[in-house]
């Protein structure tokens, strides 16, 4: 049974001239070639006639020699019309009486039969396409049959491209100028590199095309490094954003107070409004520890060291130290002048990244990003 045929004509329905014609349907978003592969407007009888002409070889005038000494009979007019390359071969072929003789070797005999049949009727069996997809792809390129080329590409993109054949397809796609197919197969190789690099196909590619194998391997390394760098930047951005929120929460606690913690002159009410700063909870615990820790001198306690760092970061981003109610803000600003250039550069970079993490808007209590 024919499972794949490509349309050669557009079908249409006759309509009553007295009736208003039905408007055509909107274009489908699905792949147009997929629709063509599923049906044909050419009648079954017509397709059968072309297949029968090929199978019976009625008044054939071409002999095609394939591997293992096998022969396929065909018609010069049909082959020459379907492929300009074969047309040129027929012009140069030796003639024995009425017979033209050409050779198509290097692929299985059955693959050549499927190829020649497609030139007649644009049809193929699904099982044959599955079995000879690689050979048909090569033949479509070698003999310039764009229609078969598109069919082969479609089938590979929609199920026939697997980890078992992707290395071979990748090489063939580059050799035969299939840019889209080479991109798709390259992506699959990148995705399954560890599995594919241990296969016989990979070893064969390394032996026959060492530069290509090295290029693919290098691209895998570059992709892995790019992915790591992207992940690192994403993590850094999350940390900078958390630090920015911590700076906002610190100003909020020291200026307005939050629930049970805040300025000494603040009157806290039991029904204090819910805090909108997510960082307040963790920062509240850190401030309480800092206030009561006997080792809170710089470097004396891990938790206190973290608090000192937050206070220094605040002093560097604070826009108004004279009115600021965050402890030690002005003192730490004066301390900056005594720091080494190396430490100063490191802090400036941190400030720039923290302030830059707030892409939209910004706090009026912090310096603008451009001043960092």
From Swiss-Prot:
InterPro entries: BT1/2/3/4/5, BTB/POZ_dom, SKP1/BTB/POZ_sf, TAZ_dom_sf, Znf_TAZ. SMART domains: BTB, ZnF_TAZ. It is found in: Cytoplasm. Residues 341-364 are annotated as: CaM-binding. The keyword Cell membrane does not apply. The BTB/POZ domain mediates the interaction with some component of ubiquitin ligase complexes. It holds the Pfam family zf-TAZ. A zinc finger (TAZ-type) spans 238-330. GO terms for biological process: protein ubiquitination; regulation of DNA-templated transcription; response to auxin; response to gibberellin; response to hydrogen peroxide; response to jasmonic acid; response to salicylic acid; response to salt stress. Interacts with GTE11/BET10 through the BTB domain. Keywords: Cytoplasm, Metal-binding, Ubl conjugation pathway, Zinc, Zinc-finger. The gene is BT4. The keyword Transport does not apply. Induction: Up-regulated by auxin (IAA), salicylic acid (SA), methyl jasmonate (MeJA), hydrogen peroxide, wounding and NaCl. Pathway: Protein modification; protein ubiquitination. Residues 14-37 are annotated as: Disordered. May act as a substrate-specific adapter of an E3 ubiquitin-protein ligase complex (CUL3-RBX1-BTB) which mediates the ubiquitination and subsequent proteasomal degradation of target proteins. This is BTB/POZ and TAZ domain-containing protein 4. GO terms for cellular component: cytoplasm; plant-type vacuole. Preferentially expressed in leaves, stems and flowers.
